[in-house]
A protein has these predicted regions:
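Polytopic transmembrane helical bundles with strong interfacial aromatic enrichment
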Residues: 1-416, 647-650, 654, 661, ...
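Early transmembrane hairpin module of multi-pass membrane proteins
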Residues: 63, 69-71, 77, 112, ...
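Interfacial helix-loop-helix junctions of multi-pass membrane proteins
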Residues: 132, 203-214, 271-291, 470-482, ...
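Hydrophobic core of alpha-helical transmembrane segments in multi-pass integral membrane proteins
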Residues: 31-43, 168-173, 193, 375-376, ...
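Membrane-interface transmembrane-helix boundary segments in multi-pass integral membrane proteins
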Residues: 284-296, 361-368, 417-425, 564, ...
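Hydrophobic transmembrane alpha-helical segments that form the core helix bundle
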Residues: 266, 527-617
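Juxtamembrane membrane-water interface segments of multi-pass membrane proteins
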Residues: 84-109, 232-253, 274-283, 307-333, ...
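Functional transmembrane alpha-helices
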Residues: 200-205, 209-242, 272-275, 290-305, ...
């Protein structure tokens, strides 16, 4: 699906069925109607819309907020889905060398603009109605605007929603103002940022399982919005889409995205369900029944997607062949050829039209299922789960700080037996391993080779990353400073080395075919990012070294570390930043992927040694420090195992000691690469000499001979008569016997 159809999007096929205008008109109303029906039934059946005894917000809160949330979620999906299709599925222009904007690409941006405007307005409505629902009857007692202002400036829930509204508004402005590929991609990134904040609101920070709940909810939202949003976007541009000659390629690309989204939705949904549903009896509660119904709808949606891939996509036109014009010759053969071409064209159009008709029917069916599933998602958010996401009645000090249960006292074995799976990094590591292996398989299937040691290195690096983010180092990293330092050192100094040796960008360039229709897939976007001036700046050896070493000082001595411990977003950003810092530094020293401005080997070694020496001094400074780093956190954990200052000194020892092994490893790898590079250069020079037959040496000798002849000049007393042929041949023969030997001093002059 990475390779595009050879026909340009401007070339029109003929797979229209007459149903496309009805699909475009009916898609959104059908989605809303089914959603309203399913949502109403769910709210009534679960009792979520029933009045409460205390602090009832009235019909405005009980019914208005779910309606606003349904509109909010739908507009969010449509905005992000349409932008994603414009960025990675559709070509921006009608041809690679054309400046004319593709009509469907333009329509997608129109869909995104309308959806983003609705999303912005609905976010304001959700903010206000969330205040009404939270305040209850008191919302309308006193000054409404003043109380609302206090809610969004003093209460955490209101502050988060204010940030969400601001991000959505900024994203909407970018959607309306930017039209380039890079601009639309930037609008997509900004529009996706509210998902992080929405995932935080879905679970109490003080309740157990906060990391798993927030991570799984963020993955769930990402999967739903790109799946549902892409589907609705295709329906809204149905008439123009069916006339395209590259319809099959477009649908295949979206189908791949939908398959990935389906896997994300199923994994995250099951993870979240297991956190909120305990035993078998919990599945019979109102929450459990709605959850089972939503799961059944998701399975049906997966079956519809499987039907697309099995029975539809292969029959859609990638490029509909035009009837062949008759060639010159007798009238009878020309007529036969014209008739055969007409019959073939008619059969092709009939097959394409039948596949398109089935495709749009399945799309409408999926929209119906998605409408019900989206509404039931709102119902679940309004229904109390069997396992409440509320803080325990008597929380421990660590539960108050982190929202997690204090693990048992650490031992060497428990660092490998205690696990806390972060769904975000589970998806990243497992997904990166699967995609890498699929790329290697694609190379092998077409007869190309890929070094096995690079595959092993990549998988080893991902295994280290998986342990660092989900294993014992992560479990104890928020309890003990020493465990945090172990996690940090493995993240920034150990995991990046095998990941860099895996050469993922090189594999991507070889494994994925470039697109020919002007659209940008994964290959094009990765290469654009790798060769961008921002990537070149941060991957510059000096900048990478400063970032690698300087980030330690800024992170540990500026107070930023508190946010990485206290907030989920801060924790994820910490992992992402230090992994990137270590990766850029290792890439500048031992990497082979393109896009990095690497210094010669003799310069890289001093950069490595200076950087690691600074790192050693950093560890010594922590060992000798008498002030607690992040003392408000590590000083109040309350584990009673070891004093915080002693544990911090142990962390300094880890920072100082563990850095020696990666440094030695980097130096050895650098020396090996240096030797291999010199060997390859010598062999290349030898092959060049073998091909030229010592032409360079012969040219040099000829130059010396010419200089010698010029220095000798004409013979003394010469009358200008030419030298005899015999003498000239003899002289040339003597010179040719030793052209590389210069004339000796004191040699007798030529005879007169």
């Amino acid at each position: 699906v990475s390779a595009s159809a050879k026909a340009t999007p401007a070339t029109r096929g003929d797979a229209t069925t007459g149903i496309e205008p009805q699909v475009r008109i009916a898609a959104v109303p059908l989605f809303v109607l089914i959603g309203a029906l399913a949502g109403s039934i769910g709210l009534i059946a679960t009792g979520a819309a029933a009045p409460t005894v205390l602090a009832d917000s009235g019909p405005l809160g009980r019914w208005g907020l779910p309606i606003a949330e349904f509109v909010f979620n739908s507009a969010m999906a449509l905005t992000i889905g349409s932008l994603l299709l414009a960025v990675v599925v559709f070509p921006r222009t009608t041809g690679r060398k054309s400046s004319r904007i593709d009509p469907e690409w333009n329509r997608l941006l129109g869909v995104a603009q309308v959806a983003s405007a609705v999303w912005t307005l609905s976010s304001v409505a959700v903010l206000v109605l969330t205040y009404v629902d939270t305040a209850g009857a008191q919302a309308f007692q006193g000054e409404f605007s003043g109380q609302l202002w206090s809610f969004i400036t003093e209460i955490d829930l209101g502050r988060v929603w204010l940030a969400i509204v601001g991000l959505i508004a900024v994203g909407s402005m970018l959607v309306f103002g930017l039209r380039s590929f890079a601009g639309v991609a930037a609008a997509l990134v900004v529009s996706a940022l509210p998902i992080l904040l929405l995932s935080i609101l879905g679970h109490s920070a003080e309740a157990d399982g906060h990391i798993e709940a927030v991570g799984s909810l963020s993955i769930h939202l990402v999967g739903v919005v790109i799946w549902l949003g892409g589907l609705l976007s295709l329906a809204l541009i149905a008439p123009g889409l069916t006339r395209r000659a590259d319809l099959g390629s477009i649908v295949a690309r979206y189908s791949t995205i939908a398959l990935i989204a389906y896997a994300l939705v199923m994994y995250s949904g099951l993870t979240n369900a297991l956190l909120r549903v305990g035993g078998i009896d919990d599945w019979l509660t109102p929450y459990g029944v709605v959850l089972v119904t939503k799961l059944a709808l998701t399975i049906l949606l997966g079956f519809a997607g499987w039907s697309h891939r099995r029975a539809v996509i292969g029959r859609l036109p990638g490029a509909v062949p035009a009837p062949t014009a008759p060639r010159t010759g007798s009238d009878a053969p020309a007529a036969n050829r014209e008739g055969a071409a007409s019959r073939a064209g008619a059969a092709s159009r009939a097959t394409a039209s039948g596949a398109a008709l089935l495709f749009w029917r399945l799309v409408l069916g999926e929209i119906v299922l998605f409408g019900a599933a989206t509404a039931l998602g709102v119902v679940l958010s309004r229904t109390a789960p069997p396992v409440p996401d509320e803080p325990p009645a008597e929380p421990t000090a660590f539960q108050i700080l982190s929202g997690e249960t204090l693990p048992p006292e650490p031992t060497a074995a428990r660092y490998f037996t205690e696990w806390l799976f972060d769904p975000i990094w589970v998806v990243i590591t497992v997904g990166a391993a699967v995609l890498y292996l699929l790329a290697v398989k694609r190379l092998r299937d077409r007869g190309d080779s890929w070094p096995i040691h690079r595959t092993i290195c990549w998988l080893l690096g991902l295994a280290v990353l998986f342990y660092v983010t989900c294993g014992g180092a992560s479990v104890y990293g928020r309890v003990l400073f020493s465990a945090h330092m172990l996690q940090h050192m493995a993240l920034v100094m150990i995991a990046p080395i095998p990941l860099v040796l895996g050469a993922p960008v090189t594999l991507l360039m070889r494994g994925l075919a470039p697109r020919r229709d002007g659209s940008r897939g994964v290959r094009e976007w990765v290469l654009a990012i790798v060769h961008s001036r921002y990537a070149r700046f941060f991957s510059h050896p000096i900048v990478a070294a400063i970032n690698f070493a300087g980030s330690l000082i800024v992170f540990y001595y500026s107070g930023i570390m508190w946010y990485a411990l206290d907030t989920h977003i801060g924790h994820e950003l910490m992992i992402l930043h230090f992994l990137a810092a270590g990766y850029f530094f290792a890439q500048s020293i031992i990497g082979v992927d393109p896009g990095v401005n690497r210094y010669p080997y003799p310069v890289r070694l001093p950069i490595l040694l200076v950087t690691m020496a600074f790192h050693a001094f950093f560890g010594i400074s922590i060992m000798s420090s008498t002030a607690l780093i992040a003392g408000d956190w590590y000083g109040n954990v309350g584990h009673g195992w070891v004093s915080a200052i002693e544990d911090q000194a142990r962390g300094g020892e880890i920072a100082w000691g563990i850095g020696e092994f990666p440094t030695l490893g980097l130096a050895i790898i650098l020396a090996v690469e240096w030797f291999q590079s010199s060997t390859r250069e010598a062999k290349r020079s030898d092959r060049a000499e073998d091909r030229s037959g010592d032409a360079e040496l012969e040219a040099y000798n000829a130059m010396l001979a010419g200089l010698a002849a010029a220095n000798e000049g004409p013979p003394k007393g010469s009358t200008g008569a030419p030298v005899g042929n015999g003498e000239r041949s003899k002289e040339n023969g003597e010179r040719s016997t030793d052209r590389s030997r210069p004339p000796q001093a004191g040699s007798p002059p030529a005879e007169e």
